[in-house]
Amino acid sequence: MSKRAVLEVIALGVEDAVAAQAGGADRLELVTDMAADGLSPSAATVAGIRRAVDISLRVMIRLADGFAAGDVERLVRVAGELREAGAEEFVLGFLDAGGFVDLAAVERVVGVLDGCPWTFHRAIDRAADRDALRKQLDGVPAFELAGVEAKELNIFG
């Protein structure tokens, strides 16, 4: 197993993706609307990027600014469309009104990902109780944080 850090770059479209790969990116995180901390790209965008580059892609599943799941059925539809467009890895994370993991939403969305790897995205940064979140998500292989090391939060035990 390589100890080399993975360079992940945000891509909003095909041009970004091609430039990132040419610049040495190992992996892309595909999003739209960075002003909202990244939302789901369209299935057409994912398919276009998948055709244009040959590095790993992680695709955002989030429909609105903030970390509330919102319309879970729509999230499930979008996740399925992204999967059909060639997405094989995902980032997602939903909190309820109290700032705790919205497990029902997470489980519904993950249920349509056909076993694809996924990362609990930056919702942890806004969680009311990070220790409780970690326990709720026991077994999740990866968390993505903004500005804080995972070891500082004792995410992994």
Set out the residue ranges of the language-model regions.
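Hydrophobic faces of well-ordered beta-strands that scaffold small-molecule active sites
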Residues: 5-11, 28-30, 57-63, 90-92, ...
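N-terminal beta1-alpha1 ligand-phosphate binding loop
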Residues: 6-19, 23-24, 29-30, 37-38
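Conserved, mostly hydrophobic/aromatic
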Residues: 20, 49, 82, 109, ...
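Glycine-enriched alpha-helix->loop->beta-strand junction motifs that scaffold or abut catalytic
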Residues: 21-28, 53-56, 86-89, 112-116, ...
